[in-house]
Amino acid sequence: MYGAVSNNEAVNNAGAINRAIDDCASKGGGRVVVPQGEYSTGSVYLKSGVTLYLEPGAVLKGVHDIGAYAPLQTTLDLSRYESGQGTVNYNSATDAQWSKAMIFAVGISNAGIEGKGCIDGADVRNPLGEEHMRGPHTLLVAGCKGMKFEGFSVKRSANYAFLAYQIEKSKFTDLSIQGGWDGIHIRGAKQVEIAHCEMHTGDDAIAGGYWERMSIHHNKLNSSCNGIRMIMPSERLDITDNEIYGPGTFEHITSHRTRSEAAINLEPGGWGKAPGRMDRIRILRNRVRSVLTPLSVTLSDDNTMGSLLIEDLEARDITRMALSVKSWGRAQTDRVVMRRCNMEFQGIDDPSLPGWFDNRPTSEWPVFPVWGMYFRNVKEVDAKDVKLSVKGKDYRKPWMVDNVEKHNLHLL
C-alpha cells in the first residue's frame, strides 16, 4: 500500500515508511506494522500517537549513503548538554554531522517502537562525523513525553543506539543492544525508566546526565568502557538490581580495547562543564564482576553532592581500582552511607607501591594508595557490614579517608 520493498538494499524505504506513519497519525494514531523482511532505510520520523511495531523477523536496516540521513531539526535550546568542546569528541545537537540519525522522535508524545524485530544501524561511517568516522545515531529522541521503546533489538549502531534530549515520563524496557558505541545515552530526563534490557556495547552502556527521578533497574550491562556513566549531575537517581560485568563482548571501536572500566561512573563535568548538585543517589542490590572499579564518584569544582546510599553491592574480580567517592578540588559530598557490601579486589603484588605515593600529587596517581575504598572531601562516611577482600598480595591499606569530617567504618 505504501510501496515499501523488502530484501533489496538498493531501495531506500524511508519515503514509504514515513508515508505510513504520517497516514496513521492523520487518522488519530495507532500502530504501523513492519512485517517480516529486511527494509533498508534512511531517516524515519515518528509521530505523536503512533507506535512503530516490528514483527518477529522484521529488520529496519540503515542504508550506506550518509546523505540519506538528516540532522536533528528542533527549536529546543539544547546548548547546556554540549560536551567535549575543543576535542574530536565534541557533541552538539546543532552539529549537522553529530545529530544525524536513522530514526527521529522530535517534539512528540505517546509514541514509540515495540515488537520483537530488529533495527540494524549497519555501522555506517561518516568521515565528517565524531572522531572522523562515527555515523548516524540509530534513534534520536528530543523534547518528547510518554515515549515507549520495548522488546526489539538494536545492532551495529554507527554511533549511539539511542540518543535522547529532554525527555519525560518515558520507558526503555526489554531491549537488546549489541555493538556500536553508547547504548542508551540521555541528556536531560524526568521520570525515565531503563529496565530489563541487555546491552553489549563498545562504549558506555548507559550514559548522559541531568537526570531527575531516573530509574535504572534489572539490566544486564556489558561494556568495553563503563556500564553506567553519568557526565552531568542528577537527582533522585536509582540504580538497582543490575548485573554489570566485563570484559566487553564488543571492542571499543575507537581504542580497540575490551577491558571494562567502571561498573558505575558518576563524574559530572567529566566531558566539559556541567554545573549543579547531585543528591539522593541510591545504588542498591547490584552485582558487579571483572571491571576496573565497582563505583567511581568524582565531583568537579562546580558540583556538590548531598546523599549517596550504597546497599547490598556484590563485586568480584575488581581488576585495579578501589571504590571511590571524591573530588580533587573543593567540591564536597555531604553523606555516604554503605550497608551490606561485599567486594573482592585483585591485589597488586608490589611491596614498593605504598611508599611510591609519598609526596606525589594526586594528578600522578595511577591507582589509589589503598586497594578497597577511598573517600575524599566528604563530610560523613557511615559504612556498616562491609566486607573487603583481596585476591593475591597487596601491601597497601584496605581503605582511606582524606578530608572527611566524620567517619564510622564497620568492616567485616
Predicted features and spans:
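Extracellular/periplasmic carbohydrate-active domains that bind, remodel
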Residues: M1-L412
